[in-house]
A protein has these predicted regions:
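Short, charged recognition helix plus adjacent turn
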Residues: 79-112
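Helix-turn-helix DNA-binding elements, focusing on the entry/boundary residues of the two helices
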Residues: 25, 36, 47, 62-65
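Short, basic-rich loop-to-helix N-cap that marks the start of a DNA-contacting helix
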Residues: 57-70
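Short basic helix-loop element that most often maps to the first helix and adjoining turn
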Residues: 23-38, 100-106
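A short, Lys/Arg-rich alpha-helix, primarily the initiator
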Residues: 6-31
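Short alpha-helical DNA-recognition segment
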Residues: 33-51
């Protein structure tokens, strides 16, 4: 199976946000006077994974990003990701919909 380039899968805005996150993680590591190999050892990850995180690579797992943040004591704001209380669009949509179950709008064609 052919791999699809990240630029084809992700928006330029998202890729830029990941690059900025990687830069902030790199800055946090440097402020703690940790080399990449030191952070990799503390996190139980490879140095190449730390490099990928610091570049903001989208193919690197969310778990790896979160674990590195945790190792450096920077994981507190992870709870804010996809927080239903902060999802203005989701809240607005929930008030406009009476039905709480998610169902397909049309009947699925199971005839294959």
């Amino acid at each position: 199976m052919k791999r699809i380039a990240a630029s084809a899968l992700f928006s330029a805005e998202l890729l830029e946000r990941l690059r900025r996150l990687g830069g902030r993680i790199r800055d946090a590591r440097v402020h703690r006077r940790l080399r990449q190999v030191d952070l990799a050892a503390k996190a139980g990850l490879s140095r190449s994974t730390i490099e990928a995180i610091e570049r903001g690579e989208p193919a690197t797992s969310l778990g790896a990003y979160a674990h590195v943040l945790w190792v450096m004591g920077q994981d507190r704001e992870i709870d804010l990701l996809a927080d239903p209380g902060l999802d203005r669009q989701g809240i607005a949509l929930s008030f406009s919909s009476v039905d709480k179950r998610v169902r397909p709008r049309t009947r699925l064609d199971n005839d294959f």
